[in-house]
Structure formats: C-alpha cells, structure tokens
Amino acid sequence: MKYELQKTDGRARRGRLVFERGVVETPAFMPVGTYGTVKGMTPEEVKETGAQILLGNTFHLWLRPGQEIMKLHGDLHDFMQWHGPILTDSGGFQVFSLGAMRKIKEEGVHFKNPINGDSVFLSPEKSMEIQYDLGSDIVMIFDECTPYPADWDYAKRSMEMSLRWAARSRQRFDELNNKNALFGIIQGGVYEDLRDVSVKGLVDIGFDGYAVGGLAVGEPKEDMHRILEHVCPQIPEDKPRYLMGVGKPEDLVEGVRRGIDMFDCVMPTRNARNGHLFVTDGVVKIRNAKHKDDTATLDEHCDCYTCRHYSRAYLHHLDRCNEILGARLNTIHNLRYYQRLMAGLRQAIEEGKLEHFVEDFYGRIGKPVPPLNV
C-alpha cells in the first residue's frame, strides 16, 4: 500500500491509497461487511454506490465460518467476491463489547463464544494470523478499546497494554512475511497526555497507517473533536489516518476538517434497514405515515438506483410490508449518500473551498457549524 497526499485545505487532506487491488480516493468511507457481506447487497451493487474499499470483521469471520473455510476459497476476497481492497478490524472492539463474557489478561482475551458458548482465546498473534488468512489489504493491530467513561488510571493501563500488544502484533505480522499494510491504533480515552504517549509509542514501532480508536463510544462530541484536534498533527503526514467506527454524516465532515482520511460505520446500512434515510436536507423517516401518498423521489440531488426509479410512497409501502426489497433499496440510497458526501468533501479540498462546503452542508440540515480549534 502506498499513500499519496495530493492537496490540503487547512487540516483537511485530499489523497489516495494505492493497492495492488485498486486505488482508494481519500477522504474515504468504508461500508461495513461484518460477516463477509454488506447486508443485503451484492458486491456489484456496493461498487455502484461508489465504494472502493470495504471493512470486514475479523472476530465474526473467525468464529463463523472460520479460517479453514476461508482458505478453501483462497481468502476473504474470493469468498465474498469483492475484488477491491478490504480492511479488517482486529477483533478488539468486539471482544470489548462482550462485557462480562470476557477476561482481559496480558497474554490476550479469554471469552465465551457468543454463538455456542465454547471457551475461546484471542491474542495479538492470533489476530495477525487470522487476518493473514483473510488476505486483508489493511490489517489492524489487536488492542483493547478503552471504554467510556474510564478514569485516567484505567485509561493509562489500557493504553499501555495496547502498546505492548501493538509491538506483539507488529512482530507476528513481520514473522508471517505479510506484504500488506499494518495500521496502529491510538488509544488513551479522552486524556490528551495519554494520547500523546500512545502516538509516540506507535510511531516508534512503525506502522503503515494510524487509526484513532476509542472514540464514538459514548463521549460528548466536543471530546471527540478535541482529541482529533490534538492527535492528528502528531501523526506522520505521509501516513493515512483512520477514525474507527465513525459515524454520522456530521462526524465525517468534522473528522475531515481535522485531518482524518478514512472512516467506517454501520450507520448507513443499519439505519437503512430501519427506514432512517439520509438526504441532502437532513433525514427522511420513510416509516412515517406522511410518506404514504408522497410521489416525490427520496432526494432530488441523489443519482442512486433508488432515487432514479422509486417514489417515497413506494419505499414507505415496502417498509410497512416488511419487504426485503425495501431494506435493499434503502441501503443502496444510504450508501450512495455517504459516497456522494465523501466525493463532495474531496472536491472541496481540491478547490480550496472546504469551509464553504461545510457551511452549505450544515445550512441544508439546519444545524450550526461546530467550532474548529486548530
């Protein structure tokens, strides 16, 4: 993987990630394919929305169908028939989400398999081996996602263990002679001094890119913005920056303003299945009765398959009838909305007009522009 920084506008960056499997224009949004599928979508449909890279979930794919089934097909690309780049998370966040079902120790995490109750162990080394078998174009180190709220002492211990796990991840990745990219994950909760230690430790180890983890876990938006403003300038300029698990359209805009290059989130797909659709002027809740006889298209500014063919009334009808097609059409639209948003941000950075874009974006959805303290 090679990262090329092409243009900046303030802290915002316009670049590209070059892989053997294709080019990813940044800032980029990665649809989430947890189980080897973006829910309800064929790979061709996902590509048509403008997506150039997907996210796969190491934890879930390891538990089901497992490494051996994957290797029978070649790797995850062959298994799911997506031949563009794939980033896989390490499983750290999913283990963190298990709560009482897991025990975190220095060697790794012991937990109960949520599918069948078996005792399972996941370590930095095992995560690197699984992601190697998946053929991930971007491998994420195994870390502990520091919860929110966490006091300074807990966040410090968690961050320090994540640094030790980062070094172990790096070592096992190199032992496997993996030629793909390995990203470090910056932890430290909402504490700037801990984030400083994490960034320096990871840069000293050396990675192909750096993710900001432990945000979008319940902290106030002001804290997310503050941490990004503090951390991003410390990340080497020639390496991509990835904000994990984010987020709402406004979060993507604010991340880009602060120097983030990559995002992922289940929001566009999950919300689509619940009739919550993103449009240029905000949100349409297609389940609401007012759309029953609305012959208008979902978003007159959108060029997706759904908006080119169907009315709000039809989408409302499908949702009320629990038709699978409704969830699919909604997903196509939401994914395209996110990709159009990213394309707009990229163009604005190229033209040196990012803040004009930001003002227009917030004006359309009727919200004030958050302050930028950089």
Curated annotation (Swiss-Prot):
Pathway participation: tRNA modification; tRNA-queuosine biosynthesis
GO biological process, one term: queuosine biosynthetic process
Keywords: Glycosyltransferase, Metal-binding, Queuosine biosynthesis, Transferase, tRNA processing, Zinc
The keyword Mitochondrion appears for this protein: no
Annotated segments matching region RNA binding: 245-251, 269-273
Binding site for Zn(2+): 302, 304, 307, 333
Any GO MF annotation of the entry: metal ion binding
Gene3D superfamilies: Queuine tRNA-ribosyltransferase-like (3.20.20.105)
Stored InterPro entries: ArchSynthase1/Queuine_TRR (IPR050076), TGT (IPR004803), TGT-like_sf (IPR036511), tRNA_ribo_trans-like (IPR002616)
Domain of life of the organism encoding this protein: Bacteria
Reaction catalysis annotation: 7-aminomethyl-7-carbaguanine + guanosine(34) in tRNA = 7-aminomethyl-7-carbaguanosine(34) in tRNA + guanine
Residues at which substrate binds: 89-93, 143, 187, 214
Quaternary assembly: Homodimer. Within each dimer, one monomer is responsible for RNA recognition and catalysis, while the other monomer binds to the replacement base PreQ1.
Function: Catalyzes the base-exchange of a guanine (G) residue with the queuine precursor 7-aminomethyl-7-deazaguanine (PreQ1) at position 34 (anticodon wobble position) in tRNAs with GU(N) anticodons (tRNA-Asp, -Asn, -His and -Tyr). Catalysis occurs through a double-displacement mechanism. The nucleophile active site attacks the C1' of nucleotide 34 to detach the guanine base from the RNA, forming a covalent enzyme-RNA intermediate. The proton acceptor active site deprotonates the incoming PreQ1, allowing a nucleophilic attack on the C1' of the ribose to form the product.
HAMAP family with a match to the protein in the record: Q_tRNA_Tgt
Similarity-based family: Belongs to the queuine tRNA-ribosyltransferase family.
Name listed for the protein in its UniProt record: Queuine tRNA-ribosyltransferase
Source taxonomy: Bacteria, Pseudomonadati, Pseudomonadota, Gammaproteobacteria, Enterobacterales
Gene (name only): tgt
